[in-house]
Amino acid sequence: MGNVHVYTWEPNSNAGKPLFALAEKGVAFEYHYINLTDFEQHAPEYLKINPAGTVPTLIHDGQVFTESTPMCEYISTAFPGISLVPEDPRARYRMRWWCRQVDINAAALSVLGWHTFLGPMVRQKPPEELERLIARIPTKERRLFWKTASQATFTEEQLANARARVGTWVARMDARLAESPYLVGPEYTLADLVAFANFYALPLTVPEHASEERVPHYIEWLRRIYRRPATLATYANARSLGRRAFQIARSIGVLPPEGPSS
């Protein structure tokens, strides 16, 4: 299989996608932890690997892969083991359609995640250090986003819109999951992996939209994926934000009340 290196952060959102994919495939790899709260993705040594300053980055036999969703499709097809990509052309189309929709709708969740979790973590740094770290971000767009997030300047309107978008999206997922156990059909695919990596924590992040009473099929889908051996094995390597997965798994009955938590 060759040498496999993954440069990424927690098993959370885009950063977690290749970790779940490699675990599902049973591929051994070297995990290079890039701490986003220390802005390590913008350090000169990392920018030599990925000039965009984003995570994740996969290196397989010297070839560099970026962009988390196509990266996971590469992982599925390049290595032996379980296939995450359907062979049937129509099912493959549906898989890619759902992956694209997840990537579009994850932007709203990113706003909430930054406001609730990452922003407070980053703001622990001295203002002068934070300003210096933001200044070295390669793109103007990302510099503005990090500045907004780190200064807690998302408006109430932005936050309300983000919550509404996430609520609409999870309701749409729930409607689909009322028809089949997974997003594409009866089998777990890359669409589920990508969606789970981004939306695994909704019962904690937006409980008003992601309760069992409101979206029971989504909650049952969460249970199915949390029970996959690759899922909890991946979260076992989390150091900070990803550890909340154990709290959620307990809250929905996947783990006993006193399971792993830190």
Regions found by a protein language model. Give the residues of each.
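Active-site-flanking alpha-helical
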Residues: 76, 198-199, 235
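Short, solvent-exposed turn/loop segments enriched in Gly/Ser/Thr/Pro and often Arg
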Residues: 9, 35, 190-192, 238-239
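Long, positively charged, glycine-interspersed low-complexity recognition regions
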Residues: 212-262
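Residues at helix-coil transition
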Residues: 76-80, 178, 226-227
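GST-like domain detector, emphasizing the conserved glutathione-binding G-site
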Residues: 1-139, 252-253, 261-262
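Short secondary-structure boundary/hinge segments and terminal tails
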Residues: 39-40, 76, 195, 242-244
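GST-like fold's C-terminal all-alpha helical module
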Residues: 106-223
